[in-house]
Structure formats: structure tokens, C-alpha cells
A protein has these predicted regions:
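Terminal-region recognition feature
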Residues: 1-206
């Protein structure tokens, strides 16, 4: 029978988690609702990460030790809001630091806000589909209202753009100046799976 274990009142979230597979499906636009679902899934799967396992998995007679099972994230998205991307990234970093590895898989398309999430996986465990298309572009926002509110909005957009660049650089082989150069053309920058490996966005092609 299927058993559901509740730890500290944390229950399996509905979509997008697959508890038995320890997999989170991040498909579609990254919205406030999607961000909340992914964060809930990360925290639930983190709570059930530690299990008894063999010290040497190849030796059935080796001592039993507590091991941390990794979490997998399947990613296929056109992107979404920066604030919800940052909420996912902050929780991913927290889980990696204190509990377990996170394996990321980019399939189909990984664009805009989805790119740092793919790159935020544990180094050596970030994979991308051979036919996956990756895309970077400048932060976008609609402005309106008085000139003062538009100036305020512009300052916020600049801050988000700088933070996006710094964050992506921290996960990859790209420097902030290299990312700014890529984005300088004011257009969408499409990247192949092979280029993503060279840039350090992912580690392996599947």
C-alpha cells in the first residue's frame, strides 16, 4: 500500500511534485502560483531526504549509514516573473546547503527566468536535452502612470536586471560582463545545448 509520511506537518503538495520519484515538474510560465507549488515541493521532498542506506552501495554487507537522496527538477518553460524565480532559487540554494543535491534537467525549452533555475542545480548534476533551446533576454516590464512612477519603475527594473545577471554569473562560467555583452544587442539570445555546456549553464547533454 502507498504510505504517506507527514514530517513536521509537511504534507505532499498537489502538483508539481512526484513524491515516489522525488521529482518536481516545472512546466509552463513561472508565476506566483507556480513558484509557491515548486517551493512547497522542494520543502516536502527535503523533509524526506534522509534514509538509511549502505555505506558502499556495491557491497550488500557494508555498514548502514544515513544518506541524503537527491531531488530532481524537470524544467521546460518560456520564463516568467523575476520575483518568483528568485523565490525558487533562494529555496533551492537553502536545500542544497543544508540537506541534499538537486539535479536539474532542461528539456524542450528553458528560457528567461528558467535559465538560472536550470543553472542552480548541483554542479555536475545539471543536464540538458540535446534538442533543448535555451534563451536569455533583458528584463521586461510595462510602464505607465506619472513620470515619477515611471522613473521609480525604471530603477526597479535596473535593479532586477543587475541581480539577474549577478545570479546567473554565480551559477555558471559566464562573468557579469560577458552576460551584459550577450544582452547588449537588445534581442533574444538563443543558446544550443552544446553552448550551454561551454557556458556552464549545464554539465551534461542527455
Amino acid at each position: 500500500d502507498k504510505q504517506i509520511v507527514i514530517v513536521n506537518n509537511i504534507q505532499p503538495p498537489p502538483s508539481p511534485a512526484e513524491p515516489e520519484l522525488r521529482t518536481i515538474n516545472l512546466y509552463g510560465d513561472i508565476s506566483e502560483r507556480k513558484g509557491a507549488d515548486v517551493v512547497a515541493a522542494l520543502l516536502y521532498l527535503e523533509s524526506s531526504s534522509h534514509v538509511l542506506g549502505l555505506e558502499d552501495p556495491k557491497d550488500s554487507e557494508s555498514a548502514q549509514v544515513i544518506v541524503a537522496r537527491s531531488i530532481a527538477m524537470m524544467i521546460s518553460t518560456h520564463g516568467g516573473t523575476a520575483s518568483d524565480m528568485f523565490s525558487i532559487l533562494d529555496v533551492m540554494d537553502m536545500v542544497k546547503d543544508r540537506t541534499c543535491d538537486i539535479e536539474t534537467f532542461g528539456i524542450g525549452k528553458v528560457m528567461s527566468a528558467g535559465v538560472p533555475i536550470l543553472a542552480a542545480g548541483t554542479k555536475g548534476k545539471r543536464k540538458v536535452g540535446r534538442n533543448c533551446r535555451i534563451m536569455l533576454h533583458n528584463v521586461m516590464a510595462g510602464t505607465g502612470g506619472t513620470i515619477f512612477s515611471m522613473e521609480n519603475e525604471l530603477e526597479e527594473i535596473k535593479w532586477v536586471q543587475e541581480r539577474y545577471i549577478e545570479t546567473l554569473a554565480s551559477y555558471t562560467k559566464l562573468t557579469p560582463s560577458k552576460i551584459k555583452k550577450l544582452l547588449k544587442a537588445q534581442r533574444d539570445v538563443y543558446i544550443s545545448a552544446e553552448e550551454a555546456i561551454k557556458m556552464g549553464i549545464a554539465d551534461e547533454i542527455i
